Amino acid sequence: RLDNKSDFNFSTESLKVKLNKYALLTLHRPSNVDFEIKFKEIVGAINKISKEIPIIFSVHPRTTKRIKEFNIEFSPNVFLIGPVPYLEFLNLWRDAQVVLTDSGGLQEETTALGVSCVTIRENTERPVTVSKGTNLLAGTAAKDIEHSFRMSLKSPQKKLRPISLWDGLAAMRIVEILRWV
């Protein structure tokens, strides 16, 4: 059963997980969830990883449909929750040991807060999160997801990762360019 945002109290204790001792999972991209064989392979990796660490899976509505359609089952250590409001979701991934995702935005947000991230995709439109951030690009094969997860655990403890040009001064730089033009 998926708890919806109105009855989930956002306490990791209610899920029997401890701060910084769980993984947060999100999957929503059609390329990952709309094809049964690929989705089941990804879930196989997730179920194996859950033997090492509890996983909180914030399930997108389109993903919920595919879980039912493909009759996908998760191990008992994968806790499925419905979508949650942004600030509560931010707390979930900020307090996670690692985030497993196919979301582009989460790659940036985890890098900004120094949270390890494993991106379950073949490519990323945010390469700076891999080269200078906390993101590992895993691909979608089960063995690669599992390997990247284990590599993420070897990452240094959380610390803010300043990325050049992520300093909040974009408007000032644009004005300077416009003055030059």
What are these regions (language model features)?
Residues 1-35, 138:
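A nucleotide-sugar donor-handling region in carbohydrate enzymes
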Residues 1-8, 136-181:
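Leloir-type glycosyltransferase catalytic cores
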Residues 18, 43-59:
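A conserved nucleotide-sugar
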Residues 39, 86-89:
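Acidic, amphipathic alpha-helical patches
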Residues 61-77:
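Short, structured helix-loop element that forms part of the nucleotide-activated donor/catalytic region
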Residues 77-85:
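Active-site donor-binding acidic/aromatic loop of nucleotide-activated sugar
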Residues 118, 133-138:
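A short acidic/histidine/glycine-rich donor-binding loop in glycosyltransferase catalytic cores
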